[in-house]
Curated annotation (Swiss-Prot):
Family, as annotated: Belongs to the NqrC family.
Quaternary structure annotation from Swiss-Prot or TrEMBL: Composed of six subunits; NqrA, NqrB, NqrC, NqrD, NqrE and NqrF.
Chain's role: NQR complex catalyzes the reduction of ubiquinone-1 to ubiquinol by two successive reactions, coupled with the transport of Na(+) ions from the cytoplasm to the periplasm. NqrA to NqrE are probably involved in the second step, the conversion of ubisemiquinone to ubiquinol.
Gene: nqrC
Protein name: Na(+)-translocating NADH-quinone reductase subunit C
Amino acid sequence: MASKSRHYLNQPWYIILFIFVLSLVAGTLLSSVSYVLSPIQKQAAEFDRNQQMLMAAQIISYDNKFQIYAEGDWQPAVYNTKKQILEKSSSTPPQVTVATLCSYFQNFVRVLLTDSQGNLSSFEDHNLNLEEFLSHPTSSVQDHSLHVIYAILANDESSKKLSSSQVAKNPVSIESIILPIKGFGLWGPIYGFLALEKDGNTVLGTCWYQHGETPGLGANITNPQWQQNFRGKKVFLASSSGETDFAKTTLGLEVIKGSVSALLGDSPKANSAVDGISGATLTCNGVTEAFANSLAPYRPLLTFFANLNSSGESHDNQ
């Protein structure tokens, strides 16, 4: 009797209905989980991107701790949450958290814009929405007439009170600048940041926060040991006499096949080149092209910073 009442279990329509209902339930559950986790994933991605950015600028060490430039070197630091400022630490500082990173970012990082003339401006000046403008990270920096720059302000009380418009108008409070870098590796797009000192020429550091390169080979562009090779390099190639023509000289950083010291010695070109990664020539070529193409629109701005800091004077950007 029971077997007769369940004869439909072997019917094609029942099997199809069962699969449909199961798929519908599973799909609904997955969609719900994705919806719930989406804000968390977005926050995690933003934290990682900002963390990598500040690592390039040396504000955060490779072991995820704040540091501050003092006495001619980078020293361990702690973020004072009450004063909202970095202070030199006499002991091992704690790990950077989401809260401390967000607070530092809000107080000491200004997202600005620059045009083809090297003029600085804020998003408010152009009545642009920051989130909307940055919502397409896959677009080239050359797709816009305005280009993004992240400005790191001096670690003091007066700087953190400055608005983006005030910083853009008189950028003497800027201690370092971070530029977005985008290019193509062996397997696809690569995205990163390049941090420069306020002279617009000397590299503080670099990072790559998104790529699809081969683990153990091209993926080593994210290796801190390799990234440290960029520190102190110059993005403007100096002439054989040591002089730099910011308006005309080659702008970028070259990742060469082999050793810089062996191939270039102490020539000016050595100051704008780093050792390549063994077995990742195509990725390294992509990194070289990424620097050249991404930095090109920023030449007027970098030249402005070079002139601004060589004169040591405070004057309006516009």
